[in-house]
Amino acid sequence: MALTKAEMAEHLFETLGINKRVAKEMVESFFEEIRGALESGEQVKLSGFGNFDLRDKNQRPGRNPKTGEDIPISARRVVTFRPGQKLKTRVEAANTGK
């Protein structure tokens, strides 16, 4: 099961007592800030959680799986996420029953 933006908004509604529309707008605004920063080429650092980084990948050779034909895979920029140590520790503890 996955945590959705709707569930995050519902949690804000239940814990903070704000109305559902405002909670949904807060969640959307949070993710829009992250998107905007990444689109501008900025790294996003969320203390205690992790970092969203941009990596430039060079062009490389590839193969069409249907035809076997060699084709170039174009250069591109990708988003990567590196979890912080606190997040790693909490996830590990939750999965080992500590």
From Swiss-Prot:
One of its GO terms (molecular function) is structural constituent of chromatin. CDD domains: IHF_A. InterPro entries: Hist_DNA-bd (IPR000119), Histone-like_DNA-bd_CS (IPR020816), IHF-like_DNA-bd_dom_sf (IPR010992), IHF_alpha (IPR005684). The keyword Transcription regulation applies. GO terms for cellular component: cytosol. Coiled coil: none annotated. Signal peptide: none annotated. Keywords: DNA recombination, DNA-binding, Transcription, Transcription regulation, Translation regulation. Residues 49-71 are annotated as: Disordered. Gene3D superfamilies: IHF-like DNA-binding proteins. GO terms for biological process: DNA recombination; positive regulation of metabolic process; regulation of DNA-templated transcription; regulation of translation. Belongs to the bacterial histone-like protein family. Heterodimer of an alpha and a beta chain. This protein is one of the two subunits of integration host factor, a specific DNA-binding protein that functions in genetic recombination as well as in transcriptional and translational control. This is Integration host factor subunit alpha. It comes from Shewanella oneidensis (strain ATCC 700550 / JCM 31522 / CIP 106686 / LMG 19005 / NCIMB 14063 / MR-1). The lineage of its organism: Bacteria, Pseudomonadati, Pseudomonadota, Gammaproteobacteria, Alteromonadales.
